[in-house]
């Protein structure tokens, strides 16, 4: 596997996901380690998660609820720049050229060295991780990252009309990928991850105290599989050099 860029050399990271809470389930502990090290992290949500939830809240109220929850969750891990795309809907996300263009726009605005997103590859043994929207967000992000973001002739209106210069992202990190091989120790940031996920009350309140145990169990298993010392907690990613 490629050796990831040292955190000390990464000034900005862009996280692109399909729904509110996706980044927090998959990478909140890692994100907190980055922000505590001085890395500027931006969240980009492709939808407002309007199909999520476990109660009878009117659907038209859900986007505002989930946006507020995501902003609170982001704050728990040190992220203040949270952006939402408009015009895309939970349950019907596709890696269209329009979605790719909108992600390229943010890549050129933020100019990150690293992008973290969802794996575009279906994981048959963990089908729950392969929600179609997750696959679409990951596919659109990878297409945006290479080659469009660095190509001045891709979406030329971004350069001519908006003045957004091409940008080369050097590294992609994929969540929920079957071939993930880079574990990050999140023992010291687990409480931040838990706080972030509790902030998504419309999605997690029904779990009660079981939420902490589930997260702890997942993190412990990942750490054990990565050969970390007993009692450690981790998140795992597939890292791809894209520079």
PLM segments and residue spans:
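Metal-dependent de-N-acetylase/amidase catalytic core
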Residues: 1-14, 95-243
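Active-site rim/loop-helix segments in enzyme catalytic domains that contact anionic ligands
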Residues: 1-111, 238
């Amino acid at each position: 596997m490629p050796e990831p860029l040292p955190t000390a050399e990464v000034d900005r990271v862009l996280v692109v996901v399909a729904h509110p809470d996706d980044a927090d389930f998959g990478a909140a502990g890692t994100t907190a380690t980055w922000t505590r090290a001085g890395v500027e992290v931006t969240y980009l949500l492709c939808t407002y998660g309007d199909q999520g939830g476990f109660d009878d809240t009117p659907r038209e109220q859900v986007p505002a609820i989930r946006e507020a929850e995501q902003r609170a969750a982001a704050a728990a891990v040190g992220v203040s720049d949270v952006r939402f795309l408009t015009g895309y809907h939970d349950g019907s996300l596709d890696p269209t050229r329009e979605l790719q263009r909108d992600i390229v726009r943010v890549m050129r605005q933020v100019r990150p060295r690293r992008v973290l997103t969802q794996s575009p590859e279906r994981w048959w043994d963990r089908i729950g991780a392969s929600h179609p929207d997750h696959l679409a967000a990951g596919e659109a992000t990878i297409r945006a990252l290479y080659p469009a973001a660095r190509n001045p002739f891709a979406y030329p209106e971004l350069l001519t009309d908006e003045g957004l210069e091409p940008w080369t992202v050097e590294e992609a990190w994929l969540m929920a990928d079957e071939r993930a091989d880079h574990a990050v120790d999140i023992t010291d940031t687990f409480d931040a991850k838990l706080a972030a996920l509790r902030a998504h009350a419309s999605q997690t309140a029904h779990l009660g105290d079981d939420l902490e145990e589930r997260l702890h169990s997942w993190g412990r298993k990942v750490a054990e599989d990565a050969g970390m010392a007993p009692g450690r907690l981790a998140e795992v990613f597939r890292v791809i050099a894209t520079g």
